[in-house]
């Protein structure tokens, strides 16, 4: 029995990235033997065990043979005669197919170290096309390692296109699509995840609502980049520079989905996209099973981002109406997230990335002024029942007028 450190832990160590999780592969053992050593069996599809002390995952070396459709359509063989090289051969990318012995010796039969040096994401074997999930994984790795200069090997991109055209991606479950998408949001370049999926054709299959934005024009006066899809990628990147919040980064990517269903006869104008986008976002979130925290922020940004952009023109009563709709009196922390998304939208335009965004400060000033008007003061003044709400709104409007010097 021999044990090797494998996968991401070896890769990240070689890239001088902090190793968070360690995965191990066990060669020359059986489930019975592992159980006798105190390891806890947890694998359903193949033999995986938790170490009795560290609780790290130890998987028996295995081979996989395609036996059906989708990423679960495999038959696994995990007997004691499976070699380390055979186990590494089934992995997706060469940089993930490097093992390390207990003495620190690297076993690298598929030249992963060379690809790490050359900053290449390359498939291990042509069996890559048997697993549709690998398209999303490669896109995620491209996003994660973009800051290090990694690119996808041309022959691997070609296999990704082959996988897409085979129809295999239709067998991906919504949970797996969201799992990879959400992981990509935590990278330094979430936009690369979408652009890679667009390049290989997968975006139209797994996230057609975002794919529909490409080729849709916007007014050049406001959007020098013109293409809505390109704008979305730019906004995504700006959001990642402004915040590490995953809901903010998600909302930035979907805030303009309404533009994807604007009738061509109305192009390049999209006057109703803040309203039409609501249903598109709801349907997307339902299909891919996006958590409510993400969905709620995305809907708020979709509905209100054009109003925020017009903050310098808004009347005091309009500010209060917007704050009411955002439910800020109960959830004031929402405002910062919404405004950061709007700032990313403003900056996500070709040549305008560094333009100031005074609208954010104006919205904050208006809300801070309105928030200082307290209900107890209205009640103490003798107002009762429905009068309280009316007077509270009236006082909030006056507070905004004073704060923003609005007549």
Swiss-Prot record:
Free-text cofactor note: Magnesium is required for nucleotidyltransferase activity. Nickel for phosphatase activity.
Residues that bind CTP: 8, 11, 91, 137, 140
One MF term in the entry's GO annotations: cyclic-nucleotide phosphodiesterase activity
Reaction(s) the record says it catalyses: a tRNA precursor + 2 CTP + ATP = a tRNA with a 3' CCA end + 3 diphosphate; a tRNA with a 3' CCA end + 2 CTP + ATP = a tRNA with a 3' CCACCA end + 3 diphosphate
PROSITE patterns: HD (PS51831)
Keyword rRNA-binding: no
Binding site for ATP: 8, 11, 91, 137, 140
InterPro entries assigned: CCA_bact (IPR012006), HD/PDEase_dom (IPR003607), HD_domain (IPR006674), NT_sf (IPR043519), PolA_pol_head_dom (IPR002646), PolyA_RNA-bd (IPR032828), tRNA_CCA-adding_enzyme (IPR050124)
Pfam families per the UniProt record, alphabetical: HD, PolyA_pol, PolyA_pol_RNAbd
Residue span(s) of domain HD: 228-329
Keywords, comma-separated and alphabetical: ATP-binding, Hydrolase, Magnesium, Metal-binding, Multifunctional enzyme, Nickel, Nucleotide-binding, Nucleotidyltransferase, RNA repair, RNA-binding, Transferase, tRNA processing
Protein name: Multifunctional CCA protein
Organism classification: Bacteria, Pseudomonadati, Pseudomonadota, Gammaproteobacteria, Vibrionales
């Amino acid at each position: 029995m021999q044990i090797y450190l494998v996968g991401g832990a070896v890769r990240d160590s070689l890239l001088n990235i902090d190793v968070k999780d360690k995965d191990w592969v066990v060669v020359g053992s059986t489930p019975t033997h592992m159980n006798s050593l105190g390891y806890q069996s947890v694998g359903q599809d193949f033999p995986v065990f938790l170490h009795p002390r560290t609780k790290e995952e130890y998987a028996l070396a295995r081979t996989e043979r395609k036996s059906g459709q989708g990423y679960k359509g495999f038959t696994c063989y995990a007997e004691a005669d499976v070699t380390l090289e055979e186990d590494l051969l089934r992995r997706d990318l060469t940089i993930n197919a490097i093992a390390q012995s207990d003495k620190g010796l690297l076993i690298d039969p598929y030249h992963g170290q060379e690809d790490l040096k050359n900053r290449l994401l390359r498939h291990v074997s042509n069996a890559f096309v048997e697993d549709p999930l690998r398209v999303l994984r490669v896109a995620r790795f491209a996003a994660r390692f973009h800051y290090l200069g990694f690119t996808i090997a041309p022959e691997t991109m070609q296999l990704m296109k082959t996988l897409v055209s085979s129809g295999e991606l239709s067998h991906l479950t919504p949970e797996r699509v969201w799992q990879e998408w959400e992981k990509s949001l935590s990278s330094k370049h979430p936009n690369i995840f979408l652009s890679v999926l667009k390049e290989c054709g997968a975006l139209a299959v797994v996230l057609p609502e975002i794919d529909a934005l490409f080729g849709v024009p916007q007014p050049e006066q406001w959007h020098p980049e013109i293409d809505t899809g390109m704008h979305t990628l730019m906004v995504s990147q700006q959001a990642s520079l402004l915040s590490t919040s995953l809901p903010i980064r998600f909302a930035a990517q979907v805030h303009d989905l309404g533009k994807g269903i604007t009738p061509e006869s109305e192009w390049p104008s999209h006057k109703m996209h803040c309203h039409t986008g609501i249903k598109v976002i709801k349907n997307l979130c339902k299909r891919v099973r996006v958590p409510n925290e993400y969905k709620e922020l995305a809907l708020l940004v979709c509905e209100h981002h054009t109003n925020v952009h017009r903050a310098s023109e808004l009347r005091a009563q309009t500010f209060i109406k917007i704050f009411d709709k955002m439910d800020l009196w109960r959830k004031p922390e929402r405002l910062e997230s919404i405004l950061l998304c709007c700032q990313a939208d403003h900056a996500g335009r070709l040549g305008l990335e560094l333009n100031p965004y005074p609208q954010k400060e104006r919205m904050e000033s208006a809300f801070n002024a309105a928030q200082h008007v307290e209900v107890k003061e209205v009640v103490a003044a003798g107002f009762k029942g429905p009068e309280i709400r009316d007077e509270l709104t009236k006082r909030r409007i006056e507070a905004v007028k004073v704060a923003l010097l609005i007549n």
